[in-house]
C-alpha cells in the first residue's frame, strides 16, 4: 500500500480529536490524529504496545512519562509499553499527528 499526502486524510471534529485509520496490519497500526486548537488526548497508557507520535502539521505539547516538551512538524516522540503519555494542541492552528502503534490495538 502506498499513501501519498497523508495529512490530507485528516478528519477534524469540533468536540474532540479526530481519528483516521491509515493502515492496520498484523503487527502495526498507523493512524492520523487531528486536533483543533486546544484539543487534547488525555494521559493514558497502552499495555503491551509501543506508540510513536510524528507531528506532521502544527505544534504539539507532549508528555511521555515524566518528560514534557513541545514538538514541531517533523519531530517525534515514543512512548514505550505501559508508559503514560498525553498530547495537546497548544497553538492557534490545527495540528495533525501520525500515530503508530505496535502491535496494533485489539478489535
What do the predicted segments below correspond to?
Residues 28, 48, 67, 83, ...:
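A generic "binding-loop/recognition-motif" signal
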Residues 40-42, 61, 77, 81-87:
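Histidine-centered metal-chelating micro-motifs
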Residues 46-73:
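A short beta-strand-loop-beta hairpin characteristic of the jelly-roll/cupin
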Residues 26-28, 36-40, 59, 103-107:
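Short, charged/polar surface micro-motifs in flexible loops or helix N-caps
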Residues 31-33, 53:
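Conserved hydrophobic/aromatic positions in well-ordered beta-strands
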Residues 81-106:
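Ligand-binding loop in jelly-roll beta-barrel domains
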Residues 1-31, 42, 73, 77-78:
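A short, N-terminal "cap"/entry segment at the start of jelly-roll beta-barrel domains
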Amino acid at each position: 500500500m502506498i499513501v501519498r499526502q497523508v495529512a490530507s486524510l485528516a478528519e477534524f471534529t469540533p468536540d474532540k480529536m479526530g481519528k483516521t485509520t491509515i493502515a492496520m496490519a498484523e503487527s502495526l497500526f498507523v493512524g492520523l490524529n487531528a486536533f483543533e486548537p486546544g484539543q487534547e488526548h488525555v494521559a493514558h497508557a497502552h499495555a503491551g504496545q509501543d506508540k510513536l507520535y510524528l507531528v506532521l502539521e502544527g505544534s504539539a505539547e507532549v508528555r511521555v512519562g515524566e518528560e514534557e516538551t513541545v514538538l514541531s512538524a517533523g519531530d517525534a516522540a515514543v512512548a514505550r509499553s505501559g508508559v503514560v503519555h498525553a498530547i495537546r494542541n497548544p497553538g492557534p492552528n490545527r495540528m495533525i499527528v501520525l500515530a503508530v502503534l505496535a502491535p496494533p490495538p485489539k478489535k
